[in-house]
């Protein structure tokens, strides 16, 4: 019997493997943590009974190597525990400067407040961590924000470093006398709790446990609903299958676990599924900005300049590189802006919930504009999937740089036929940067064997950001 099938007597719903990983992080056992993370079904953003994430414990314990490992694999920097502490609160309060610096470099919210109204700077000042206070102030931490008791970081500061911290604040243009009263923002729902561990432990769920609130969309694939499950915001996809036979139900049960990929920051995993014919439901985390297609082409508050466009492209390339490293590979994830989601930190993630099952839409292509000529004329089993995905990525690059929908003037069938048989291609307009123009052309090489792989283009995109 495997470890994952043993359960604690005092917590019958908590597998030993989950309990162990929190212990390994607290102990600083980097080797065991790495082994646990290498299983892509393990969700590194889960919380324990008090909603402490693995990153919370690494930050509190000062385990730099583990913190680096978690951050590199997509740990959510601004997740909060039950007391509304972020990992930055804990690192600052316990004097772990290396981790503070790493969290700040990952866009940690420097002025986040916990249930007491305390910011990370409050704790750095209270414990006299002068260098950490300077790091925080340099990144925008405010010295004049009051906690629930009306006290600023300088009010609670250790006398020995108060004058130094005051000078640092003044050098950064802050006026400590302009006190900012405490404002309770918890009602706004802006805080991001760690995921309940049950979200990544459950694979099969009962449809009746889903509270589906609002229908977001309906298409040939099925219905998309926003709702709640276990108190968490989720999106449920109810698949459109004419008749759910015993074989289809069995195939669904066999195929969906491969979509539970938690091990990469640029992949949005399937959390669970409900297999209750006639209902087949896929459950994933709700993303506030929706799909990249929505961000680019529909009403969205996101401002996309050239730098943000390249960052989106880099996120997508990193996610695709990881997918291409899997053995066996996913056969039916069709890359397009409709199948990429954007989280609250403007990180692009490949949506595993948009992967097609073997029984879905067989022989049909509803978004051919992003597909390579060979993908439109061959079955996935007979295709060089890596090369076909690179063509799709080139169309995404074109879309990010032009802000246009490819072949929007053509119906899908005509578009697909012309791409496959008549040489229809996107036109790269003048004004696109020369290096981006060249990258698009390389990725869209007519010879699939001459297209690069994602590991080769990631360094190119990284240089474009610098």
UniProtKB/Swiss-Prot annotation:
Probable pseudokinase that acts as an adapter protein. Component of an integrin containing attachment complex, which is required for muscle development and maintenance. Involved in the assembly of dense bodies and M lines during body wall muscle development by recruiting several of their components including integrin pat-3, cpna-1, unc-89 and unc-112 to integrin-mediated attachment sites. Plays a role in distal tip cell (DTC) migration and in oocyte development probably by regulating the actin cytoskeleton. It comes from Caenorhabditis elegans. It comes from the Eukaryota. Keywords: ANK repeat, Cell adhesion, Cell membrane, Cytoplasm, Membrane, Repeat. GO terms for biological process: cell differentiation; cell-matrix adhesion; embryo development ending in birth or egg hatching; integrin-mediated signaling pathway; mitochondrion organization; muscle cell cellular homeostasis; myofibril assembly; positive regulation of establishment of protein localization. Belongs to the protein kinase superfamily. TKL Ser/Thr protein kinase family. This is Integrin-linked protein kinase homolog pat-4. The protein kinase domain is predicted to be catalytically inactive. The keyword Aminoacyl-tRNA synthetase does not apply. GO terms for cellular component: adherens junction; basal plasma membrane; cytoplasm; focal adhesion; integrin complex; M band; striated muscle dense body. Interacts (via protein kinase domain) with unc-112 (via N-terminus). Interacts (via ANK repeats) with unc-97 (via first LIM domain). Interacts (via protein kinase domain) with pat-6 (via C-terminus CH domain). May form a complex with unc-112, unc-97 and pat-6. Does not interact with integrin pat-3. Component of an integrin containing attachment complex, composed of at least pat-2, pat-3, pat-4, pat-6, unc-52, unc-97 and unc-112. Its main location: cytoplasm. Pfam families: Ank, Ank_2, PK_Tyr_Ser-Thr. Gene3D superfamilies: Ankyrin repeat-containing domain, Phosphorylase Kinase, domain 1, Transferase(Phosphotransferase) domain 1. It is a peripheral membrane protein. Changing residue 257 to L: Restores the interaction with unc-112 when mutated at 'Asp-382' and the localization of mutated unc-112 to integrin adhesion sites in body wall muscles. It is found in: Cytoplasm, Myofibril, Sarcomere, M line; Basal cell membrane. GO terms for molecular function: ATP binding; integrin binding; protein serine/threonine kinase activity; protein-macromolecule adaptor activity; signaling receptor binding. ANK repeats lie at residues 50-79, 83-112, 116-145. Residues 210-465 form the Protein kinase domain. Expressed in body wall muscle. SUPFAM superfamilies: Ankyrin repeat, Protein kinase-like (PK-like).
